[in-house]
Amino acid sequence: MLHFHAPENWINDPNGFIFYNQQYHLFSQYFPYGKRWGTMHWRHAVSEDLVCWKDLGIALFPSRPEDQNGVFSGSAIEKDGKLHLFYTGVQYQDFAENNIHKNGPKGFLSWQLALTSPDGYTFDNFDGKKVVVPLSTDPEIYDPQHTRDPKVWKSEHGYTMVLGSTVQKQGRLLFFVSEDLEHWTLKNIFQKEGLGWMFECPDLFEVDGQHVLLFSPEGTGPYGFDKNQAYIALADFDPSDCALDLPKPVEPIDWGMELYAPQSNIDSNGRRTVMIWLRMPSDFAAEKWIGLYTYPRVLNIENGNPKWSVHPNVLKRFSQKAEFGRLDPNAPFRMQTTLKKGETMNAFGLKIGFDGTALYTDRSAIITTPGLSPAAYVPCEGQEVKLDLFGDKYVFELFVNEGQQVLTQYVNGFENAVDSIPSQAVLTTTEEC
């Protein structure tokens, strides 16, 4: 596969994504003992181009009381040539029955910690960790259990950290500020009704003159694998006092409803680049690993709307022309075409149709997971729709109308079947890393 995944076991959220010392660094929420969620570690990989990754094994692991039951999600930032990692550490109050890798009904406690690496390769898990945001002592400000996922960035006003939290079953964002990355002060709080009971993995940044919030609120579904989904919102944000407002409705980051926990940073050319976790069925048995990330996506704002594209480093690999009927359907492929109103097609087992108001997909021929809906749709109107379809063994990413919307979903594998493919369709492929 060309998509990022661990060599074995479980991964979920992308963490610590950064271009540092002329390399891309990417960490993953990782469970080293099997293909299921459990005591979280950070697994580390590096890349020169965001496409081919070198696995470096575990970077962060539980080592002190505040993170003894998991090194949860977080982010990375460079300062004075060093790589600073921020994450949530958890301590279980009890355990699930016969499983020390999950908490029991009493839940857990959360701290925010930092670790500084001198070079991006060396991580002192025993003496290098420091608590930077303590356990909450006032649950009316932030919850002692459900406060997590620090994203840290620098602006002209210093350093800012945003955390997801909850109070009285309503999600909120906490904004902390610092001058030195060590001492943090709560600056502001954002809360809005109707967006779920807990905000996970917040990511706030400016692109094309517009502030954007990516976040994963819990309790907004149910859709797909989970009732928790990833969303995007155009935001009004004042970095001087961290005042945030979301004047427009939030939208799904992806219409496949199977992505979660996006994390962004700036690539080597200044593009806002996003990595996103694709959730996979728990019974996935075809590989030693479970969990993968989308191709890195570039986010822009055009005419006041988000626009997504596959990163240019990925696109330039798809230079080998291929023929329908002769291509191995489980090799990485890209198909570019246009569907007119009323047309349908079958692309390697994925059925796609357009009725003038929405684009529909049907993956029933290439999934077997019971209870998982085979159908999905993207709202779009017109007489025709432009499609850019990327397939890679266990996943398809469908970019609609040049990235105005995207639909990404898991599949068991593609078929040789093709039918009613428009004559102008262009099919290309590439080698794996």
Descriptions of predicted regions:
Residues 197-202, 259-262:
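Repeated scaffold domains used in trafficking and secretory/extracellular systems
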